[in-house]
Amino acid sequence: MSNLPVIIGFGGINASGRTSSHHGYRRLVLDHLDTQSRLDTLTDLATLTNKATFYNGLFYLAGEAQGLTQTQLTAQLGDQVKDATLIRPIRTEAYDVEKLVLNKVAQIVPASGDYTCIRMRKRHLPNQLPDNWQVSQIDGDTVEVTISGAFTAILPDTKRAPVSAAGQLPDGFDPSSLYQSRNHPRNLQMTVFGASDALSSTGIAWQILQDHVAPDRIAVYASNSIGQLDEAGFGGLLKNPSTGKRITSKQMPLGYGQMPADFVNAYLLGSVGAVGSALGACATFLYNLRNAVEDIKSGRRDLVIVGGSDAPITPEVMEGFRTMGALAEDHELCALDGGNEADLRRTSRPFSTNCGFTMGEASQWIVLTSDTLALALGAQIHGAVAGVFVNADGHKKSISAPGIGNYVTLAKAAALTESILGAESLRHRSCVQAHGTSTPQNRITESHVINETAKAFGIKDWKVAAVKAYLGHSQGTAGGDQLAVSLGLWRYGILPGIASIDHVASDVHDSHLAIQAAHHEVGTEGIDTVLLNSKGFGGNNASAVLMGPHVANRLMVKKHGFKAMENMRSAQETHNQAANDYDLQSMRGLSNPTYKFGHNVLTGEDLLINRHQIVIPGYAKAIDLSVSNPFEDMC
């Protein structure tokens, strides 16, 4: 019997705010929401960014004694929190764009004579003295160095960064302050927050989820595309020796790209189930989603946590992408607009006249189960993932240039949609969440992929969205951003337009596409499927078929029957209320992420092992050792 992978929880954080309860999505369509939804999201941003606290029924601004109602709070802070989100100027908390470190190597020669004399602390002397140095003691801590002839020095220097905008997490939000972060890289701090948000959004305690399945039928598939490259991870590991700092014992292990999965297992779930971390550049999230979907469809797993977390807004990473010609530079934006000052809120312009992508950061997570487990739990159904297709590009010249693999993945995704729901649904009730990076190359190549697929399947005016216009490009987690926004479509009926553009570029292939700045008003059941599209450096292409909750429920009724689905409604209402309670606590700034350091650490002595099973303390079900012979016909 088939297994449908359904989404029972989702959460995270990016430039639009908290993901659960659709708050991040709401930020993109804020002016089109009902009053209460708009107030709730602005309130959530106010407390998330530490601009307000909640006490005894009222909100308080920092340093003020007068309590405010929710309406009063949002009236005062609404514009501030909107300005503190989405793509905007890089804040000094990340780094100072006016003082980007770029030290200079200089050859120093004596101004007169053959020698240069300098004084320094003795402990600052290099271990290996140059041959032309003579050192004499001045006092207990000071030495004089006489240098014969020229010597080389690295002089501290800075310059203004050519790129000064990014899709950062909301200003004032500090994930390290929410738990004992112990000098964790920013990426992993975001992981703890994002995965906790997703788990809490289910409205079901993890212990209950865990008790429904055997330990080995759980999995966590998560990673990022470039590892942890800030000071606390690989960034510090690589540059500390050359800047006079020591390498710490944490920088090496905490820099690995699979650490988001490791942290979730070790500090949130205590899971001993399957674990994996696929890497596929900008398609990384969908690669991990594919592993989860295939596991559930095949019956190998019942419950999978899928996620990604990328924090690439560091001076070195930004400069690396800039020198590739990939990022939108300030002077290029000025040239596009014919002005002297770059519009740092509109740096990302997918499918319009553009000059490069804008960096973003994000942590996105979903809780995926089989339809059978979701039914048994009475879980909320937010959507379903019918399949994820992955293909390479074939032979290349430049390793970073796009190739033909994306034609294969998107065509397969369209074909699967048609096979499940029919040609009419594909043609009239599907849309595409494009990779949409805002580079000149992407606007041509990806639009051609989507347009040719539309032609092949008889689709006219295929709606195309591109959330990087709002959020920037969060690298390996970008597919998670696309998925999270798509789930909001089925709650509020609005597919976000590409609001940063005022025209579609003349070289975009759009004869069969609908690309526009305005939002698409489609209704909560007007779209059956969203095709998520990702393209990554090196030839990493992935396309996923995401189906709406109304479609997932219809398929589940067909399999389990109407009565079984009706019987789960009571449990769904309970879990929905628990999720709403969590959302309310979060909006008030009263919830903290899960972080269980040193909790219930087991050793081999704690296990009960016999020929038939392994019993693990804390799990209601044992691991079954009745393994069938997969090569019976050969034995």
Ranges and model annotations:
Residues M1-I226, D230-G273, E294-K297, S309, ...:
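Conserved "HGTGT" condensation-loop signature of ketosynthase/thiolase-family condensing enzymes
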Residues A274-L279:
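Short loop-beta-helix segment that forms the pyridoxal 5′-phosphate
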Residues F285:
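Short conserved active-site loop signatures built around small residues
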Residues N288:
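Active-site histidine-anchored catalytic micro-motif
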Residues N291:
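Active-site signature of alpha/beta-hydrolase-fold catalytic machinery across serine-
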Residues D302-I305:
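Short acidic donor-binding loop at the edge of a beta-strand
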